[in-house]
């Protein structure tokens, strides 16, 4: 059953954190625990999105907001709670900044040579990602990410968030569990 699996999972995460502590590498190890987007409401009450509305495959916050726990003793203050906007791909430049490469996003935009096991290649790409390190360590009060684009599982743009404002372009009006996956989104004439 679901409950037993979660209890077992929690125990395994605890064992891993204990091992990191026992090895004396906690202050040199960033642990990020996260999930994918929103639960399926058909697993209620286990798949709740409280206080957010709805579930996966909708345009509502319950489909996109997720818990994320971060542990880095000595760098990130324990017990901190944040509702700032971040995305999973923000971890790429954040981890590299923690490892001593704080400017990877700018370098990749300009074109950056990377040696991959003796094979040197140039990568020139734009990554929609931000280094979260100054925010996570308390150097700045806000996340560098100010906006978020909401996509459906078919890559349709459902909405756009900027700070606390959200514009919805397509809405999932179906109420309920698996039927949500069968019903199309309703395009709005005006957001």
Language-model regions, residue ranges each:
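Solvent-exposed, polar/charged alpha-helical surfaces in well-ordered, non-transmembrane soluble domains
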Residues: 4-7, 11-14, 18, 93, ...
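C-terminal cap/loop subdomain of S1 sulfatases and analogous C-terminal strand-loop tails that border
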Residues: 39-61, 76-80, 84, 89-191
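Metal-dependent active-site segment of extracytoplasmic phospho-/sulfohydrolases and closely related
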Residues: 8-44
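Generic beta-strand/beta-sheet core signal
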Residues: 32-34, 71, 168-170
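Active-site regions of oxyanion-processing enzymes, predominantly non-cytosolic
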Residues: 1, 21-30, 61, 159
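Catalytic cores of eukaryotic secretory-pathway lumenal/extracellular enzymes that build
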Residues: 3-6, 57, 65-69
């Amino acid at each position: 059953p679901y409950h037993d699996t979660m209890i077992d999972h929690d125990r395994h995460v605890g064992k891993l954190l204990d091992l990191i502590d026992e090895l004396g590498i906690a202050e040199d190890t960033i642990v990020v625990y996260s999930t994918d987007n929103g639960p399926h409401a058909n697993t209620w009450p286990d798949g709740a999105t409280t206080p957010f509305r709805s579930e996966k495959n909708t345009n509502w916050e319950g489909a996109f907001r997720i818990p994320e726990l971060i542990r880095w003793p000595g760098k990130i203050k324990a017990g901190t709670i944040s509702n700032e906007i971040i995305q999973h791909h923000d971890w790429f430049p954040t981890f590299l900044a923690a490892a001593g490469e704080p400017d990877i996003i700018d370098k990749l935009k300009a074109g950056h040579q990377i040696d991959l096991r003796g094979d040197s290649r140039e990568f020139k790409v734009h990554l929609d990602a931000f280094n979260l390190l100054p925010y996570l360590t308390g150097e700045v009060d806000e996340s560098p990410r100010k906006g978020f684009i909401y996509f459906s599982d078919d890559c349709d743009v459902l909405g756009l968030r900027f700070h606390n404002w959200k514009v919805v372009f397509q809405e999932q009006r179906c109420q309920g569990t698996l039927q949500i996956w069968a019903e199309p989104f309703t395009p709005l004439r005006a957001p």
